[in-house]
């Protein structure tokens, strides 16, 4: 559930920066923004990566979430719904921003309806 609080610990609704390995080669990756959607039972964060690549707009696994302070150029962003990342709290490089509640709820609704989250 949505509960952002910029207190140093990441919470659902916050966008944080962390290392995300590439799917095709997990030994490589890049630092990128991730929307925290929940906590796993072991305390790790569950998150969805963001992208500002415009070609994501036509991909059904990417949901447009608009622009926000997580992109310093103010570009529209997209959240990837079909790849959930498990991120240890110590793996977060920095807290970035809070996603507005209405946009977070849209992401949550898509996860529930299309991906079986509850």
Where would I find each of the regions flagged by the language model?
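Short alpha-helix capping/helix-loop boundary micro-motifs
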Residues: 1-5, 22
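Beta-hairpin (beta-strand-turn-beta-strand) motif
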Residues: 21, 50-52, 84
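Short N-terminal helix-initiation segments at or just after the protein's N-terminus
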Residues: 24-29, 114-116
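Compact nucleic-acid interaction/catalytic patches
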Residues: 26-31, 36-69
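C-terminal terminal-subdomain/extension
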Residues: 66-118
């Amino acid at each position: 559930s949505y509960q952002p609080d910029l207190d140093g610990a990441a919470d659902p609704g916050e966008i944080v920066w962390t290392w995300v390995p590439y799917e095709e080669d997990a030994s490589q990756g890049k630092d990128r923004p991730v929307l925290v959607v929940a906590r796993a039972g072991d305390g790790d964060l569950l998150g969805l990566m963001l992208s500002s690549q415009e070609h994501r707009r036509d991909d059904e696994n990417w949901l447009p979430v608009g622009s926000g302070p997580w992109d310093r150029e103010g570009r529209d962003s997209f959240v990837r719904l079909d790849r959930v990342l498990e991120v240890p709290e110590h793996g977060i490089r920095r807290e970035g921003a809070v996603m507005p509640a209405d946009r977070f709820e849209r992401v949550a609704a898509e996860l529930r309806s299309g991906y079986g989250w509850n």
